Amino acid sequence: MSISLKKSGMLKLGLSLVAMTVAASVQAKTLVYCSEGSPEGFNPQLFTSGTTYDASSVPIYNRLVEFKTGTTEVIPGLAEKWEVSADGKTYTFHLRQGVKWQDNKDFKPTRDLNADDVVFSFDRQKNTNNPYHKVSGGSYEYFEGMGLPDLISEVKKVDDNTVQFVLTRPEAPFLADLAMDFASILSKEYADNMLKAGTPEKVDLNPIGTGPFQLLQYQKDSRILYKAFPGYWGTKPKIDRLVFSITPDASVRYAKLQKNECQVMPYPNPADIARMKEDKNITLLEQPGLNVGYLSFNTEKKPLDDVKVRQALTYAVNKEAIIKAVYQGAGQAAKNLIPPTMWGYNDDVKDYTYDPEKAKQLLKEAGLEKGFTIDLWAMPVQRPYNPNARRMAEMIQADWAKIGVQAKIVTYEWGEYLKRAKAGEHQSVMMGWTGDNGDPENFLPPLFSCAAAKDGSNYSRWCYKPFEDLIQPARATDDHNKRIELYKQAQVVMHDQAPALIIAHSTVYEPVRKEVKGYVVDPLGKHHFDNVSVE
Protein backbone atom coordinates (compact mmCIF):
# COMPACT_ATOMS: atom_id res chain seq x y z
CA MET A 1 0.00 0.00 0.00
CA SER A 2 1.30 3.47 -0.79
CA ILE A 3 0.50 4.55 2.77
CA SER A 4 0.84 1.54 5.01
CA LEU A 5 -1.32 0.93 8.02
CA LYS A 6 1.86 -0.02 9.83
CA LYS A 7 3.20 3.50 9.45
CA SER A 8 -0.05 5.32 9.92
CA GLY A 9 -0.67 3.85 13.39
CA MET A 10 -4.08 5.09 14.42
CA LEU A 11 -6.51 6.14 11.72
CA LYS A 12 -8.43 9.10 13.12
CA LEU A 13 -11.66 9.48 11.30
CA GLY A 14 -12.57 12.72 13.02
CA LEU A 15 -15.56 11.31 14.86
CA SER A 16 -16.21 12.01 18.52
CA LEU A 17 -15.73 8.73 20.38
CA VAL A 18 -17.28 7.71 23.66
CA ALA A 19 -14.50 6.62 25.98
CA MET A 20 -14.69 2.90 26.40
CA THR A 21 -12.44 0.03 27.25
CA VAL A 22 -12.35 -3.53 26.06
CA ALA A 23 -12.18 -4.69 29.64
CA ALA A 24 -14.60 -5.37 32.41
CA SER A 25 -17.57 -3.21 31.56
CA VAL A 26 -19.14 -4.41 28.34
CA GLN A 27 -22.22 -2.35 27.60
CA ALA A 28 -25.49 -4.03 26.74
CA LYS A 29 -25.41 -3.24 23.04
CA THR A 30 -21.67 -3.59 22.52
CA LEU A 31 -20.11 -6.83 21.30
CA VAL A 32 -16.38 -7.41 21.59
CA TYR A 33 -14.73 -9.86 19.20
CA CYS A 34 -11.22 -11.04 20.08
CA SER A 35 -9.76 -11.03 16.58
CA GLU A 36 -6.50 -12.80 15.81
CA GLY A 37 -4.56 -10.06 14.03
CA SER A 38 -4.48 -6.66 12.39
CA PRO A 39 -5.97 -6.27 8.92
CA GLU A 40 -3.68 -5.53 5.99
CA GLY A 41 -5.99 -2.69 5.00
CA PHE A 42 -9.66 -1.84 4.62
CA ASN A 43 -10.19 -2.42 0.89
CA PRO A 44 -10.98 -6.11 0.29
CA GLN A 45 -10.13 -5.78 -3.41
CA LEU A 46 -6.44 -5.56 -2.51
CA PHE A 47 -5.97 -8.48 -0.13
CA THR A 48 -6.78 -12.16 0.41
CA SER A 49 -6.54 -12.81 4.16
CA GLY A 50 -9.56 -13.70 6.24
CA THR A 51 -8.33 -11.32 8.94
CA THR A 52 -8.65 -8.43 6.50
CA TYR A 53 -12.04 -9.56 5.19
CA ASP A 54 -13.48 -9.86 8.70
CA ALA A 55 -12.48 -6.24 9.35
CA SER A 56 -13.53 -4.78 5.99
CA SER A 57 -15.75 -6.57 3.50
CA VAL A 58 -17.93 -8.32 6.10
CA PRO A 59 -18.95 -5.38 8.34
CA ILE A 60 -18.44 -2.36 6.04
CA TYR A 61 -19.25 -3.37 2.46
CA ASN A 62 -21.83 -5.20 0.37
CA ARG A 63 -21.76 -6.97 -2.98
CA LEU A 64 -24.27 -7.32 -5.82
CA VAL A 65 -25.10 -10.76 -4.49
CA GLU A 66 -24.30 -12.26 -1.10
CA PHE A 67 -23.91 -15.65 0.50
CA LYS A 68 -26.70 -16.28 2.98
CA THR A 69 -25.00 -16.29 6.37
CA GLY A 70 -24.00 -19.79 7.41
CA THR A 71 -24.42 -21.24 3.89
CA THR A 72 -23.03 -21.06 0.34
CA GLU A 73 -26.46 -20.12 -1.06
CA VAL A 74 -26.32 -17.02 -3.29
CA ILE A 75 -29.01 -14.45 -2.45
CA PRO A 76 -29.74 -10.87 -3.59
CA GLY A 77 -27.53 -8.14 -2.17
CA LEU A 78 -27.14 -4.71 -3.73
CA ALA A 79 -28.83 -6.24 -6.77
CA GLU A 80 -32.49 -7.11 -6.19
CA LYS A 81 -32.65 -9.41 -9.22
CA TRP A 82 -30.68 -10.45 -12.29
CA GLU A 83 -30.93 -12.24 -15.61
CA VAL A 84 -28.42 -14.39 -17.50
CA SER A 85 -28.45 -14.55 -21.30
CA ALA A 86 -29.09 -17.84 -23.10
CA ASP A 87 -25.43 -18.11 -24.12
CA GLY A 88 -24.30 -17.59 -20.51
CA LYS A 89 -22.14 -14.60 -21.38
CA THR A 90 -24.24 -11.60 -20.30
CA TYR A 91 -25.38 -10.96 -16.72
CA THR A 92 -27.80 -8.08 -16.16
CA PHE A 93 -28.20 -6.82 -12.58
CA HIS A 94 -31.00 -4.57 -11.35
CA LEU A 95 -29.82 -2.53 -8.38
CA ARG A 96 -31.68 -2.03 -5.13
CA GLN A 97 -32.82 1.59 -4.91
CA GLY A 98 -32.39 3.89 -1.93
CA VAL A 99 -29.14 2.29 -0.68
CA LYS A 100 -27.24 4.85 1.41
CA TRP A 101 -23.48 5.37 1.65
CA GLN A 102 -21.67 5.87 4.94
CA ASP A 103 -19.71 9.07 5.58
CA ASN A 104 -16.64 10.37 7.41
CA LYS A 105 -14.93 13.70 8.06
CA ASP A 106 -13.59 13.81 4.49
CA PHE A 107 -16.74 12.79 2.66
CA LYS A 108 -20.48 13.39 2.81
CA PRO A 109 -22.31 11.52 0.04
CA THR A 110 -24.72 13.50 -2.15
CA ARG A 111 -26.44 10.51 -3.74
CA ASP A 112 -27.42 6.87 -3.19
CA LEU A 113 -25.72 3.83 -4.67
CA ASN A 114 -25.99 3.66 -8.46
CA ALA A 115 -24.53 1.86 -11.47
CA ASP A 116 -21.49 4.17 -11.57
CA ASP A 117 -20.29 2.68 -8.28
CA VAL A 118 -20.49 -0.87 -9.62
CA VAL A 119 -18.68 0.01 -12.84
CA PHE A 120 -15.94 1.84 -10.90
CA SER A 121 -15.43 -1.02 -8.44
CA PHE A 122 -14.64 -3.49 -11.23
CA ASP A 123 -12.95 -1.06 -13.61
CA ARG A 124 -10.41 -0.19 -10.92
CA GLN A 125 -9.35 -3.84 -10.80
CA LYS A 126 -9.50 -4.55 -14.53
CA ASN A 127 -8.41 -1.36 -16.27
CA THR A 128 -4.72 -0.46 -15.90
CA ASN A 129 -5.56 3.08 -17.04
CA ASN A 130 -8.07 3.65 -14.27
CA PRO A 131 -6.60 6.39 -12.01
CA TYR A 132 -7.13 4.12 -9.00
CA HIS A 133 -5.63 0.97 -10.50
CA LYS A 134 -2.18 1.50 -8.95
CA VAL A 135 -3.31 3.20 -5.74
CA SER A 136 -2.24 1.37 -2.55
CA GLY A 137 0.03 -0.92 -4.55
CA GLY A 138 -2.53 -1.97 -7.13
CA SER A 139 -2.37 -5.70 -6.33
CA TYR A 140 -5.71 -7.35 -7.11
CA GLU A 141 -4.81 -10.93 -6.28
CA TYR A 142 -8.26 -12.46 -6.36
CA PHE A 143 -9.43 -10.63 -9.46
CA GLU A 144 -6.27 -11.49 -11.38
CA GLY A 145 -5.67 -14.92 -9.87
CA MET A 146 -9.15 -16.04 -10.92
CA GLY A 147 -8.49 -14.90 -14.48
CA LEU A 148 -11.20 -12.23 -14.38
CA PRO A 149 -9.31 -9.66 -16.51
CA ASP A 150 -9.63 -12.09 -19.42
CA LEU A 151 -13.09 -13.36 -18.51
CA ILE A 152 -14.83 -9.99 -18.12
CA SER A 153 -15.00 -8.22 -21.46
CA GLU A 154 -16.96 -5.25 -20.17
CA VAL A 155 -18.90 -3.93 -17.20
CA LYS A 156 -21.32 -1.33 -18.49
CA LYS A 157 -23.97 0.98 -17.12
CA VAL A 158 -27.34 0.46 -18.80
CA ASP A 159 -29.02 3.12 -16.66
CA ASP A 160 -28.62 4.41 -13.09
CA ASN A 161 -30.08 1.22 -11.64
CA THR A 162 -28.94 -1.42 -14.16
CA VAL A 163 -25.49 -2.90 -14.82
CA GLN A 164 -24.38 -5.51 -17.35
CA PHE A 165 -21.37 -7.82 -17.17
CA VAL A 166 -20.34 -9.10 -20.60
CA LEU A 167 -18.08 -12.17 -20.49
CA THR A 168 -15.76 -13.58 -23.12
CA ARG A 169 -17.03 -17.09 -22.37
CA PRO A 170 -19.54 -18.80 -20.09
CA GLU A 171 -18.24 -19.25 -16.54
CA ALA A 172 -20.19 -21.67 -14.35
CA PRO A 173 -19.33 -20.15 -10.93
CA PHE A 174 -19.46 -16.48 -12.02
CA LEU A 175 -22.52 -15.53 -9.96
CA ALA A 176 -21.02 -17.05 -6.82
CA ASP A 177 -17.75 -15.27 -7.60
CA LEU A 178 -19.58 -11.94 -7.39
CA ALA A 179 -20.55 -12.75 -3.79
CA MET A 180 -16.89 -12.95 -2.80
CA ASP A 181 -15.04 -10.25 -0.90
CA PHE A 182 -13.03 -8.84 -3.82
CA ALA A 183 -16.37 -7.97 -5.50
CA SER A 184 -17.31 -5.48 -2.77
CA ILE A 185 -18.81 -2.27 -4.14
CA LEU A 186 -17.01 1.02 -3.39
CA SER A 187 -18.28 4.58 -3.79
CA LYS A 188 -17.20 6.27 -7.02
CA GLU A 189 -18.20 9.66 -5.65
CA TYR A 190 -15.87 9.17 -2.65
CA ALA A 191 -13.10 8.00 -4.97
CA ASP A 192 -13.54 11.01 -7.25
CA ASN A 193 -13.47 13.42 -4.31
CA MET A 194 -10.32 11.91 -2.82
CA LEU A 195 -8.59 11.87 -6.20
CA LYS A 196 -9.40 15.55 -6.66
CA ALA A 197 -8.07 16.27 -3.15
CA GLY A 198 -4.82 14.45 -3.94
CA THR A 199 -5.43 11.75 -1.30
CA PRO A 200 -6.73 8.71 -3.24
CA GLU A 201 -5.27 6.27 -0.72
CA LYS A 202 -7.88 7.41 1.82
CA VAL A 203 -10.44 5.31 -0.07
CA ASP A 204 -8.54 2.22 1.08
CA LEU A 205 -7.58 3.43 4.55
CA ASN A 206 -10.77 5.21 5.65
CA PRO A 207 -13.46 3.02 4.08
CA ILE A 208 -16.91 4.15 2.97
CA GLY A 209 -19.36 1.32 2.35
CA THR A 210 -23.05 0.43 2.38
CA GLY A 211 -22.78 -2.34 4.97
CA PRO A 212 -24.23 -2.83 8.46
CA PHE A 213 -21.29 -1.32 10.36
CA GLN A 214 -19.32 1.89 9.92
CA LEU A 215 -15.64 2.23 10.89
CA LEU A 216 -15.00 4.76 13.66
CA GLN A 217 -11.41 4.11 14.70
CA TYR A 218 -8.51 1.76 14.08
CA GLN A 219 -5.44 1.40 16.28
CA LYS A 220 -3.02 -1.09 14.76
CA ASP A 221 -2.40 -4.22 16.82
CA SER A 222 -4.85 -2.97 19.46
CA ARG A 223 -8.47 -2.51 18.39
CA ILE A 224 -10.98 -1.59 15.70
CA LEU A 225 -14.15 0.27 16.66
CA TYR A 226 -17.34 0.26 14.57
CA LYS A 227 -20.84 1.61 15.07
CA ALA A 228 -24.05 0.28 13.56
CA PHE A 229 -24.68 2.25 10.36
CA PRO A 230 -28.04 4.01 10.88
CA GLY A 231 -28.68 4.27 7.13
CA TYR A 232 -28.15 0.57 6.43
CA TRP A 233 -30.57 -0.72 3.78
CA GLY A 234 -30.91 -4.20 5.30
CA THR A 235 -32.08 -5.42 8.69
CA LYS A 236 -30.60 -3.11 11.31
CA PRO A 237 -27.88 -4.67 13.51
CA LYS A 238 -28.96 -5.70 16.99
CA ILE A 239 -25.85 -4.17 18.56
CA ASP A 240 -24.85 -0.50 18.60
CA ARG A 241 -21.10 -0.97 18.78
CA LEU A 242 -18.76 -3.65 17.49
CA VAL A 243 -15.21 -3.82 18.83
CA PHE A 244 -12.40 -5.96 17.46
CA SER A 245 -9.94 -6.49 20.32
CA ILE A 246 -6.84 -7.59 18.40
CA THR A 247 -5.35 -10.51 20.33
CA PRO A 248 -2.86 -12.70 18.41
CA ASP A 249 -2.34 -15.26 21.21
CA ALA A 250 -5.10 -17.89 21.35
CA SER A 251 -4.56 -18.51 25.06
CA VAL A 252 -4.99 -14.81 25.80
CA ARG A 253 -8.15 -14.74 23.66
CA TYR A 254 -9.57 -17.59 25.71
CA ALA A 255 -8.68 -15.83 28.98
CA LYS A 256 -10.49 -12.70 27.75
CA LEU A 257 -13.50 -14.78 26.77
CA GLN A 258 -13.63 -16.38 30.22
CA LYS A 259 -13.53 -12.93 31.87
CA ASN A 260 -16.21 -11.59 29.50
CA GLU A 261 -13.73 -9.06 28.10
CA CYS A 262 -14.84 -10.39 24.74
CA GLN A 263 -17.86 -12.43 23.77
CA VAL A 264 -16.67 -14.20 20.60
CA MET A 265 -13.22 -15.53 19.69
CA PRO A 266 -11.86 -17.37 16.65
CA TYR A 267 -9.26 -20.11 16.30
CA PRO A 268 -8.92 -21.60 19.78
CA ASN A 269 -5.94 -23.74 20.69
CA PRO A 270 -6.85 -27.40 20.14
CA ALA A 271 -5.56 -28.08 23.65
CA ASP A 272 -8.27 -25.79 25.06
CA ILE A 273 -11.21 -27.46 23.30
CA ALA A 274 -11.94 -29.98 26.06
CA ARG A 275 -12.05 -27.24 28.71
CA MET A 276 -14.29 -25.10 26.54
CA LYS A 277 -16.76 -27.95 26.21
CA GLU A 278 -17.00 -28.11 30.01
CA ASP A 279 -17.26 -24.35 30.56
CA LYS A 280 -20.83 -23.46 31.58
CA ASN A 281 -20.40 -19.86 30.39
CA ILE A 282 -19.35 -20.79 26.86
CA THR A 283 -21.10 -22.34 23.88
CA LEU A 284 -18.64 -24.17 21.64
CA LEU A 285 -19.91 -24.21 18.06
CA GLU A 286 -18.26 -26.51 15.51
CA GLN A 287 -18.47 -27.75 11.93
CA PRO A 288 -16.19 -29.43 9.35
CA GLY A 289 -13.98 -26.80 7.78
CA LEU A 290 -14.07 -25.97 4.09
CA ASN A 291 -10.34 -25.39 4.34
CA VAL A 292 -6.80 -26.64 3.83
CA GLY A 293 -3.42 -25.97 5.42
CA TYR A 294 -0.34 -26.37 3.24
CA LEU A 295 3.33 -25.50 2.78
CA SER A 296 4.17 -23.94 -0.58
CA PHE A 297 7.52 -24.65 -2.25
CA ASN A 298 8.82 -21.69 -4.25
CA THR A 299 9.42 -23.45 -7.57
CA GLU A 300 11.31 -20.44 -8.95
CA LYS A 301 14.15 -21.07 -6.50
CA LYS A 302 16.63 -23.92 -6.75
CA PRO A 303 16.54 -26.72 -5.82
CA LEU A 304 12.74 -26.49 -5.46
CA ASP A 305 12.36 -26.20 -9.22
CA ASP A 306 13.12 -29.96 -9.30
CA VAL A 307 10.00 -32.10 -8.79
CA LYS A 308 12.10 -34.85 -7.18
CA VAL A 309 13.25 -32.46 -4.48
CA ARG A 310 9.66 -31.37 -3.80
CA GLN A 311 8.54 -34.98 -3.63
CA ALA A 312 11.43 -35.80 -1.29
CA LEU A 313 10.47 -33.02 1.11
CA THR A 314 6.88 -34.29 1.03
CA TYR A 315 7.80 -37.93 1.71
CA ALA A 316 10.00 -36.78 4.60
CA VAL A 317 7.19 -35.22 6.65
CA ASN A 318 5.21 -37.29 9.14
CA LYS A 319 1.78 -35.75 8.64
CA GLU A 320 0.02 -38.08 11.06
CA ALA A 321 2.33 -36.93 13.86
CA ILE A 322 1.50 -33.32 12.97
CA ILE A 323 -2.23 -34.06 13.03
CA LYS A 324 -1.91 -35.52 16.54
CA ALA A 325 0.41 -32.87 17.99
CA VAL A 326 -0.83 -29.71 16.29
CA TYR A 327 -4.51 -30.38 15.56
CA GLN A 328 -5.12 -32.67 18.56
CA GLY A 329 -8.13 -34.42 17.09
CA ALA A 330 -9.51 -31.39 15.27
CA GLY A 331 -8.06 -32.19 11.85
CA GLN A 332 -7.41 -34.85 9.25
CA ALA A 333 -4.42 -35.43 6.99
CA ALA A 334 -4.96 -33.88 3.55
CA LYS A 335 -3.97 -35.45 0.24
CA ASN A 336 -5.73 -32.96 -2.05
CA LEU A 337 -5.99 -29.20 -1.98
CA ILE A 338 -9.80 -29.24 -1.92
CA PRO A 339 -11.51 -30.68 1.19
CA PRO A 340 -13.29 -34.05 1.10
CA THR A 341 -16.67 -32.43 1.82
CA MET A 342 -16.54 -30.55 -1.50
CA TRP A 343 -17.90 -31.93 -4.79
CA GLY A 344 -15.15 -32.89 -7.24
CA TYR A 345 -12.90 -34.31 -4.53
CA ASN A 346 -10.73 -37.14 -5.87
CA ASP A 347 -10.58 -39.84 -3.22
CA ASP A 348 -8.60 -42.13 -5.55
CA VAL A 349 -5.47 -40.00 -5.12
CA LYS A 350 -2.92 -41.86 -2.98
CA ASP A 351 -1.31 -39.66 -0.38
CA TYR A 352 2.46 -39.51 0.07
CA THR A 353 3.36 -41.90 2.86
CA TYR A 354 5.88 -41.00 5.54
CA ASP A 355 8.99 -42.54 3.99
CA PRO A 356 12.37 -40.93 4.87
CA GLU A 357 14.29 -43.57 2.91
CA LYS A 358 12.29 -42.83 -0.23
CA ALA A 359 12.97 -39.14 0.38
CA LYS A 360 16.72 -39.76 0.62
CA GLN A 361 16.65 -41.75 -2.61
CA LEU A 362 14.88 -38.92 -4.45
CA LEU A 363 17.43 -36.40 -3.16
CA LYS A 364 20.21 -38.67 -4.39
CA GLU A 365 18.58 -38.84 -7.83
CA ALA A 366 18.41 -35.04 -7.80
CA GLY A 367 22.12 -34.79 -7.05
CA LEU A 368 21.57 -33.65 -3.47
CA GLU A 369 22.63 -36.72 -1.54
CA LYS A 370 24.31 -34.52 1.08
CA GLY A 371 21.18 -32.45 1.54
CA PHE A 372 20.82 -28.66 1.45
CA THR A 373 19.60 -25.71 3.49
CA ILE A 374 16.19 -24.08 3.17
CA ASP A 375 14.15 -21.41 4.90
CA LEU A 376 10.80 -22.47 6.36
CA TRP A 377 8.33 -19.65 6.96
CA ALA A 378 5.88 -20.14 9.84
CA MET A 379 2.67 -18.11 10.07
CA PRO A 380 2.55 -15.75 13.08
CA VAL A 381 -1.21 -16.21 13.57
CA GLN A 382 -3.55 -19.08 14.32
CA ARG A 383 -5.92 -20.10 11.58
CA PRO A 384 -8.47 -22.93 11.58
CA TYR A 385 -6.32 -24.79 9.06
CA ASN A 386 -3.16 -24.20 11.12
CA PRO A 387 -3.73 -23.73 14.86
CA ASN A 388 -0.03 -23.69 15.80
CA ALA A 389 2.28 -22.88 12.91
CA ARG A 390 5.40 -22.62 15.05
CA ARG A 391 4.94 -26.11 16.45
CA MET A 392 4.24 -27.44 12.96
CA ALA A 393 7.36 -25.75 11.60
CA GLU A 394 9.49 -27.30 14.33
CA MET A 395 8.15 -30.77 13.51
CA ILE A 396 8.77 -30.32 9.78
CA GLN A 397 12.25 -28.97 10.56
CA ALA A 398 13.03 -32.10 12.59
CA ASP A 399 11.68 -34.41 9.87
CA TRP A 400 13.70 -32.71 7.14
CA ALA A 401 16.85 -32.87 9.27
CA LYS A 402 16.56 -36.68 9.16
CA ILE A 403 17.15 -36.59 5.39
CA GLY A 404 19.94 -34.02 5.55
CA VAL A 405 17.87 -30.92 4.85
CA GLN A 406 18.57 -28.12 7.31
CA ALA A 407 15.64 -25.72 7.69
CA LYS A 408 15.77 -22.25 9.23
CA ILE A 409 12.41 -21.17 10.65
CA VAL A 410 11.44 -17.61 9.70
CA THR A 411 8.43 -15.51 10.68
CA TYR A 412 7.20 -11.92 10.51
CA GLU A 413 4.19 -9.90 11.63
CA TRP A 414 1.18 -11.15 9.63
CA GLY A 415 0.90 -8.25 7.21
CA GLU A 416 4.65 -8.24 6.58
CA TYR A 417 4.64 -12.04 6.23
CA LEU A 418 2.02 -11.86 3.48
CA LYS A 419 3.70 -8.94 1.73
CA ARG A 420 7.08 -10.68 1.59
CA ALA A 421 5.56 -14.01 0.57
CA LYS A 422 3.66 -12.36 -2.28
CA ALA A 423 6.98 -10.92 -3.44
CA GLY A 424 8.45 -14.45 -3.52
CA GLU A 425 11.15 -13.92 -0.90
CA HIS A 426 10.60 -17.34 0.66
CA GLN A 427 11.77 -20.83 -0.25
CA SER A 428 8.97 -22.57 1.61
CA VAL A 429 6.05 -20.83 3.27
CA MET A 430 3.11 -21.99 5.37
CA MET A 431 -0.22 -20.92 3.98
CA GLY A 432 -3.81 -22.08 3.99
CA TRP A 433 -7.20 -21.38 2.55
CA THR A 434 -10.85 -21.35 3.52
CA GLY A 435 -13.28 -21.65 0.62
CA ASP A 436 -15.17 -18.58 -0.51
CA ASN A 437 -17.97 -20.06 -2.61
CA GLY A 438 -18.17 -23.86 -2.20
CA ASP A 439 -16.71 -24.53 -5.67
CA PRO A 440 -13.37 -26.27 -6.51
CA GLU A 441 -12.75 -23.31 -8.82
CA ASN A 442 -12.24 -21.27 -5.67
CA PHE A 443 -9.32 -23.47 -4.54
CA LEU A 444 -7.33 -24.54 -7.59
CA PRO A 445 -7.08 -21.42 -9.82
CA PRO A 446 -6.59 -18.77 -7.08
CA LEU A 447 -3.83 -20.77 -5.40
CA PHE A 448 -2.01 -22.65 -8.17
CA SER A 449 -2.87 -21.22 -11.61
CA CYS A 450 -0.39 -19.43 -13.86
CA ALA A 451 -2.31 -16.18 -13.43
CA ALA A 452 -2.05 -16.51 -9.64
CA ALA A 453 1.70 -17.16 -9.97
CA LYS A 454 2.05 -13.73 -11.56
CA ASP A 455 0.01 -11.78 -9.03
CA GLY A 456 1.38 -13.42 -5.88
CA SER A 457 -1.43 -15.56 -4.46
CA ASN A 458 0.21 -18.69 -5.93
CA TYR A 459 2.96 -18.79 -3.33
CA SER A 460 4.57 -21.77 -5.08
CA ARG A 461 4.93 -19.57 -8.17
CA TRP A 462 4.13 -22.75 -10.06
CA CYS A 463 2.86 -22.44 -13.63
CA TYR A 464 2.30 -25.84 -15.24
CA LYS A 465 0.54 -26.18 -18.59
CA PRO A 466 -0.94 -29.69 -18.07
CA PHE A 467 -2.60 -28.36 -14.91
CA GLU A 468 -3.84 -25.22 -16.68
CA ASP A 469 -5.29 -27.33 -19.49
CA LEU A 470 -7.57 -28.98 -16.93
CA ILE A 471 -8.62 -26.17 -14.61
CA GLN A 472 -9.39 -23.59 -17.30
CA PRO A 473 -11.90 -25.74 -19.27
CA ALA A 474 -13.46 -26.77 -15.94
CA ARG A 475 -14.29 -23.14 -15.25
CA ALA A 476 -15.81 -22.54 -18.67
CA THR A 477 -18.24 -25.43 -18.98
CA ASP A 478 -21.62 -25.66 -17.26
CA ASP A 479 -21.59 -29.47 -17.61
CA HIS A 480 -21.30 -30.44 -13.95
CA ASN A 481 -20.11 -34.00 -14.59
CA LYS A 482 -17.43 -32.75 -16.95
CA ARG A 483 -16.28 -30.24 -14.35
CA ILE A 484 -15.99 -33.02 -11.77
CA GLU A 485 -13.85 -35.15 -14.09
CA LEU A 486 -11.55 -32.26 -15.02
CA TYR A 487 -11.03 -31.25 -11.40
CA LYS A 488 -10.32 -34.85 -10.42
CA GLN A 489 -7.63 -35.05 -13.10
CA ALA A 490 -6.19 -31.73 -11.96
CA GLN A 491 -5.80 -33.10 -8.42
CA VAL A 492 -3.77 -36.02 -9.78
CA VAL A 493 -1.46 -33.67 -11.68
CA MET A 494 -0.98 -31.48 -8.64
CA HIS A 495 -0.27 -34.49 -6.43
CA ASP A 496 2.38 -35.80 -8.81
CA GLN A 497 4.11 -32.44 -9.28
CA ALA A 498 4.01 -31.56 -5.55
CA PRO A 499 4.20 -27.76 -5.77
CA ALA A 500 3.17 -27.79 -2.11
CA LEU A 501 3.08 -30.10 0.86
CA ILE A 502 -0.66 -30.47 1.48
CA ILE A 503 -1.02 -30.97 5.22
CA ALA A 504 -4.49 -30.90 6.75
CA HIS A 505 -8.18 -30.05 6.71
CA SER A 506 -9.50 -28.97 10.09
CA THR A 507 -12.67 -28.85 12.11
CA VAL A 508 -13.66 -25.26 12.82
CA TYR A 509 -14.48 -24.36 16.43
CA GLU A 510 -16.08 -21.06 17.47
CA PRO A 511 -16.35 -20.41 21.23
CA VAL A 512 -18.93 -17.76 22.16
CA ARG A 513 -20.25 -16.55 25.49
CA LYS A 514 -23.67 -17.86 26.56
CA GLU A 515 -24.92 -14.27 26.46
CA VAL A 516 -24.42 -14.19 22.68
CA LYS A 517 -27.50 -15.02 20.61
CA GLY A 518 -27.83 -15.49 16.86
CA TYR A 519 -24.17 -16.16 16.06
CA VAL A 520 -23.70 -18.65 13.21
CA VAL A 521 -20.51 -20.46 12.17
CA ASP A 522 -19.85 -19.56 8.56
CA PRO A 523 -18.67 -22.37 6.22
CA LEU A 524 -16.62 -19.79 4.32
CA GLY A 525 -14.69 -18.76 7.41
CA LYS A 526 -16.13 -15.27 7.88
CA HIS A 527 -17.34 -13.75 11.15
CA HIS A 528 -20.71 -12.00 10.84
CA PHE A 529 -22.19 -9.87 13.63
CA ASP A 530 -25.07 -8.02 11.98
CA ASN A 531 -27.68 -10.49 13.29
CA VAL A 532 -26.04 -11.10 16.67
CA SER A 533 -27.24 -9.81 20.03
CA VAL A 534 -25.77 -9.84 23.53
CA GLU A 535 -28.09 -10.41 26.47
PLM regions: where:
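Gly/Pro-rich hinge or "lid" segments in bacterial periplasmic/extracellular proteins
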Residues: 68-69, 150, 160-161, 171-237, ...
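Surface-exposed binding/hinge segments that line
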Residues: 2, 94, 127, 131-191
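N-terminal lobe/hinge region of extracytoplasmic solute-binding protein
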Residues: 34-86, 123, 208-210
